[in-house]
Amino acid sequence: MLKEYLTEEKYEELKESNDMIYKALELSLELFKSDTDKGGFPYVLHLFYVYKNVLEKEEKVVALLHDVMEDKNVTKEDLLEIGFPSKIVSDVLVLTRRKDVSYDAYIDNIIKTGSKEALEVKLADLKNNIDLTR
């Protein structure tokens, strides 16, 4: 549940904001502020890398959010309630790998959706994930 991670004031601020990049950035910073990657670096650096390596605004929003459902207790309903458009939430959902789905099936599903945004974010994500220092 998203409200577990945010103060009521911050939740309302994000809910009222129409700036999707600001909203995604603030939310990601709150959710991952104390997490580190396997290399010991702040996890948000991974999200920033993915953000930096996509071009379109919608892709950038999805890049910042691509791990919130998989790694945190955040639902699609949470993202919709705080004001993210259904297309962005749909792309985040597509990029969320369920534990009962094989990696090959997960990648096939991303391709089959035909979402250019989800595919671009996944490619940027993979590019950063092959960096052995993180």
Question: Language-model segments: which ranges?
Answer:
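Active-site helical microenvironments for divalent-metal-assisted chemistry
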Residues: 1-134
